[in-house]
């Protein structure tokens, strides 16, 4: 597993505003969208491309274009939906699938309750959107699900990560070089309820209101 923590003043600035308990849902959604676009720039650094001829107003030359099959973006419901627009802004031709996963607040284990994905992901680059990498259970379950269906490599974009969750993911995919986590920050720890400290609260609730 590879870890990329984005060190950039704009990332830090937007993350600080997201952490602020006074930030309302509309502002939180906008900031999350902007932050994801910044993370996506780094997350797609190794996206697969191929040479492509192009004629400019001056002469013919060769550039690149995304290869087939197209990348697939997979937000984990529901909080991952708040990251989708920021991701597809940079990858507008990507396909979008969905994974519905929920964490049991007693056991902290993740279970899948819905999926809208191709059965065969052979050769696909997959970008998973999950704002909070806390215990790591949800992300491990999601990545395992995707790799079992043939995904070539999986990159997870997270607004925040906890050391405990990163260790769980690292242990699960220690020998899998094609699993990458891209995050804006690694926070101090998890509390007794499995929440990231200092964190930013429950990302889903702050994006959409408590439901």
UniProtKB/Swiss-Prot annotation:
It is an enzyme of class 2 (transferase). The keyword Chaperone does not apply. Pathway: Pyrimidine metabolism; UMP biosynthesis via salvage pathway; UMP from uracil: step 1/1. InterPro entries: PRibTrfase_dom, PRTase-like, Upp_B, UPRTase/APRTase, Ura_phspho_trans. Its cofactor is Mg(2+). 5-phospho-alpha-D-ribose 1-diphosphate binds at residues 78, 103, 130-138, 202. Keywords: Allosteric enzyme, Glycosyltransferase, GTP-binding, Magnesium, Nucleotide-binding, Transferase. Pfam families: UPRTase. GO terms for molecular function: GTP binding; magnesium ion binding; uracil phosphoribosyltransferase activity. CDD domains: PRTases_typeI. Allosterically activated by GTP. GO terms for biological process: UMP salvage; uracil salvage. The keyword GTP-binding applies. It comes from the Bacteria. Its EC number is 2.4.2.9. It catalyses: UMP + diphosphate = 5-phospho-alpha-D-ribose 1-diphosphate + uracil. Uracil binds at residues 196, 201-203. Binds 1 Mg(2+) ion per subunit. The magnesium is bound as Mg-PRPP. Catalyzes the conversion of uracil and 5-phospho-alpha-D-ribose 1-diphosphate (PRPP) to UMP and diphosphate. Belongs to the UPRTase family. This is Uracil phosphoribosyltransferase. It comes from Kineococcus radiotolerans (strain ATCC BAA-149 / DSM 14245 / SRS30216).
